[in-house]
């Protein structure tokens, strides 16, 4: 991109790729998906009050290696991270996806009637619903039960 300066001098600079944030739903397949997940996680943590946030971290392939940067946060007993750990085992991943599905199902049926979405509800109501964010790496390694709940959750994100 070229910009004309005040004195007529041309300046050239690059802009990074920009993703809308927070996205309603974001799914990406890329060889650097771990880096992308880390960047989005850091962006979320720096832009959202932690008392209004719950993050579910799933690394089904590398035993939590994708989220190594979060390990220091996990040591601090931060309750905004689901179970205060990076989920790597099939059963705990399935339970987390089931938990997220139940949360979405209950809130969509009970609290969000008459509202456009969670953001619209939180703008109007005094008891805002926390933002739930799922960071998932290794979809191919998920069990069939976990995939079932992932598909159920995905239906809410569309």
Regions found by a protein language model. Give the residues of each.
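P-loop NTPase catalytic phosphate-binding loop
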Residues: 1-158
């Amino acid at each position: 991109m070229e910009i004309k300066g005040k004195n007529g001098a041309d300046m050239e600079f690059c802009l990074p790729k920009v993703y809308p944030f927070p996205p309603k739903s974001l799914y990406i397949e890329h060889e650097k998906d771990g880096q992308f997940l880390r960047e989005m996680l850091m962006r979320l943590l720096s832009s959202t009050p932690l008392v209004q946030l719950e993050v579910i971290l799933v690394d089904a392939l590398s035993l939590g290696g994708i989220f190594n940067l979060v390990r220091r946060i996990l040591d601090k007993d931060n309750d905004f991270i689901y179970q205060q750990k990076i989920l790597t085992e099939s059963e705990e991943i399935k339970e987390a996806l089931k938990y997220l599905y139940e949360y979405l199902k209950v809130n969509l049926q009970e609290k969000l009637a008459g509202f456009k979405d969670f953001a619209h509800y939180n703008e109007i109501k005094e008891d805002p619903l926390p933002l739930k964010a799922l960071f998932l790496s290794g979809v191919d390694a998920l069990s069939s039960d976990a995939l079932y709940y992932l598909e159920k959750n995905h239906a809410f994100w569309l």
